[in-house]
A protein has these predicted regions:
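Stable alpha-helical elements in mature extracytoplasmic
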Residues: 1, 20, 24-27, 47-51, ...
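Extracellular/periplasmic Venus flytrap/periplasmic-binding protein
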Residues: 1-58
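Intrinsically disordered, low-complexity boundary segments flanking structured domains
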Residues: 2, 73-81, 161-162, 177-181
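Sec-exported extracytoplasmic/periplasmic mature domains
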Residues: 4-5, 29-36, 53-61, 78, ...
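Extracytoplasmic/periplasmic, Sec-exported soluble proteins
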Residues: 16-23, 40-47, 99-103, 124-135, ...
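Active-site lining segments that contact anionic ligands and/or coordinate catalytic metals
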Residues: 37, 61, 85, 186-189
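Extracellular/periplasmic periplasmic-binding protein-like sensory domains
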Residues: 55-132
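Segments of small-molecule ligand-sensing domains
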Residues: 117, 122-130, 136, 140-194
């Protein structure tokens, strides 16, 4: 949709997989054979790691994009191989716990303390844990906005009326906004390259 009328000229191949497939190796080989120079690796974490590894192993060097859900250093890039993940691009919206620049950040330190207390077995390099924490903060905010009217209707009304909400574990400058016609909270991302 985003490519409009040029989509047929720009998309040279697509490949899908089933979650019951043992690997996505054959799909990657097929995509490489198409001559594609860009690879949108929109897979779940397990299969994204397999795809990253296979792309590297067969010597294919496309510009590679992965979705936020498959960009976790701990859950995807380490299993794929860090050296095999160099150059991967994603859209980010949370402070990545594997990024050393946030090591002394107050919000990051608060999250680490929370992880140690409530989820000590959790992977502190997995940004999906940060996302879960932030999702809980958003929910707490919405419930607070409901005050004493804790009905589904009021919760949905509050969810449709978020204006410039910020939490310190989102990337600086990211603001959450919703409306009655668009309940998606995340509308801003920053491109990041590993």
């Amino acid at each position: 949709e985003a490519l409009g009328a040029k989509a047929d000229q720009m998309i040279v191949a697509t490949a899908s997989y089933e979650v019951t497939d043992p690997t996505v190796d054959s799909q990657i080989v097929t995509l490489q054979a198409s001559g594609a120079d860009t690879f949108f690796n929109f897979a779940t974490p397990k299969f994204a790691a397999q795809a990253i590894r296979k792309v590297y192993d067969i010597g294919w060097k496309p510009m590679q994009f992965v979705p936020f859900s498959a960009s976790s250093v701990g859950a995807v890039l380490v299993p794929a191989g860090l050296e095999k993940s160099i150059g991967i691009i994603t859209g980010g919206f949370v402070k990545d716990p594997a990024d050393p620049r946030w090591k002394n950040d107050a919000a990051f330190q608060e999250w680490l303390a929370w992880m140690k207390k409530y989820y000590p077995e959790g992977d502190v390099t997995d940004q999906l844990n940060v996302w879960g924490y932030l999702t809980a903060q958003v929910m707490a905010h919405l419930l607070t906005q409901c005050r004493d009217d804790l009905t589904r209707e009021n919760l949905m009304r509050q969810a449709a009326n978020v204006k410039n909400l910020q939490f310190p574990l989102y990337l600086p400058g990211l603001k959450l906004n919703t409306s009655e016609t668009d309940l998606r909270l995340i509308k801003q991302m920053q491109l990041m390259r590993f």
